[in-house]
Regions:
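Active-site-proximal alpha-helical scaffold in enzymes
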Residues: 1-33, 86-105, 198-223, 234-244, ...
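Conserved small-residue
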Residues: 8, 15, 44, 95, ...
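Stable alpha-helical structural segments in soluble proteins, enriched in small hydrophobic residues
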Residues: 11, 137-149, 174, 178, ...
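A glycine- and small-aliphatic-rich helix-loop capping segment at beta-alpha/alpha-beta transitions
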Residues: 16-21, 41-54, 133, 170-182, ...
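Acyl-CoA/ACP chain-elongation machinery
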Residues: 23-83, 116-130, 159-168, 185-238
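Short glycine-aspartate micro-motif
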Residues: 25-29, 92, 110, 156, ...
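Condensing-enzyme catalytic core mediating Claisen C-C bond formation in acyl metabolism
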Residues: 55-150, 155-156, 272-334
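Internal helix-turn-beta structural module
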Residues: 214-263, 267-268, 277, 282, ...
Length: 350
């Protein structure tokens, strides 16, 4: 599914919708894009939204920095006095399951994805101009968070943060207006494109991977390439993480991952702390089921550790299954008025 910079979240939403409707137990979702080539780069230059050597040097000069060489490590400066986006490349994939299926197979729960909100703009003044839809998705995410948590602690937005003039003013206004309207105080804000560039379709996957890493390690990566916020950045009720911040993981309730895509493809995804899910388990499952899950989880973590150790030593034993257990339509398939029967699979209702 293609939705410009919101593509990953569109795919995540498709999986979430199917899981919540009990049509599937799990899905592998993601996006991959490699846009750094002459044709794509020339196209972005035509939009005037991309940083080039001349713009970067001028930006460095405005900041009183050396202009003898380009500092590519700070070419993209989200929410700062910047000069345009920098193209990046990425491939991000995730396994999404229902809670019941995760417990059944002994999966390690890394987070909860309760909501993905999408609102595409129909009427726009230009193809790349932000519209009203992102206010809607962000307000929906904030509102549902308020309903879901009784004792609220900290929250953090991993912003779209492209490093363009338009983004810094419009996205900060979205965040501030929604936070202020819904009485969310001291909302932390960071972004990743100062590290990775703008990876286009997989950008939401970068944000998801980052949020999982923060829940695991307790460090929020700051806007380290941005020395100071631009004058037109809206700051009310927002706490921009200008440097890396170490946090207590238990004090962080949720992340809000935001995408403001070309063509008005807006999406905001709520990511809840895995501890939030673990506290709910006794309300949903029996003690016997939880004990069984915890034993299976130990085995999962051991396999994960062993696999990681092999990878670190250069052993990559990839799984590639070809011509294994293929179903024969003459022998393994039966179709009737009510269902489709497949050998060794549950019936499919029709």
């Amino acid at each position: 599914m293609a939705g410009a910079c919101a593509t990953f979240f569109y795919n995540l939403n498709a999986a979430s919708t199917l899981i919540k409707s009990d049509e599937i137990d799990y899905a592998v979702i993601g996006s991959a894009e490699a846009p750094i080539n002459p044709e794509v780069t020339d196209g972005f230059f035509a939009t005037t939204g991309i940083a080039d050597d001349k713009k970067i040097i001028a930006m460095q000069e405005r900041h009183g920095e050396s202009i003898e060489d380009i500092d590519f490590s700070k070419a993209c400066r989200p929410f700062g006095d910047n000069c345009g986006l920098v193209l990046g490349e990425s491939s991000q994939f995730a396994v999404v399951t229902s809670l019941e299926f995760a417990i059944k197979i002994g999966a390690e729960i890394l987070c909860a994805v309760p909501h993905v909100f999408i609102n595409s703009d129909g009427i726009k003044k230009s193809i790349s101009s932000p519209g009203i839809g992102n206010y809607i998705t962000m307000a929906q995410a904030f509102s549902n968070y308020i309903k879901d948590f009784d004792n609220k602690k900290q929250t953090c937005v991993i912003a779209h943060g492209t490093g363009t003039f338009q983004n810094r003013s419009t996205e900060s206004d979205v965040l501030s207006k929604c936070a202020t309207s819904l009485d969310i105080k001291n909302l932390k804000v960071t972004g990743l494109k100062g590290y990775l560039g703008h990876t286009m379709g997989p950008a939401g996957g970068d944000q998801l991977a980052c949020s999982l890493g923060i829940f695991n390690q307790g460090i929020i990566p700051g806007l380290n390439s941005t020395p100071i916020l631009a004058d037109d950045v809206v700051k009310e009720n927002l706490n921009f993480c200008m440097t890396n911040e170490e946090i207590n993981i238990d004090d962080l309730d949720a992340f809000f991952l935001n995408a403001k895509g070309f063509g008005g493809n807006n999406a905001t995804t709520s990511i809840y702390n895995p501890n939030f899910v673990k506290k709910l388990l006794p309300e949903i499952f029996t003690k016997k089921e939880i004990n069984s899950y915890e034993k299976s989880l130990e085995n999962t973590k051991k396999k994960k550790f062993d696999y990681n150790e092999k990878c670190l030593s250069g052993e990559f034993n990839l799984l590639y299954r070809a011509n294994e257990e293929l179903l024969n339509p003459d022998e393994d398939l039966e179709i009737n008025q009510d269902s489709i029967k497949l050998k060794d699979y549950p019936d499919i209702e029709i």
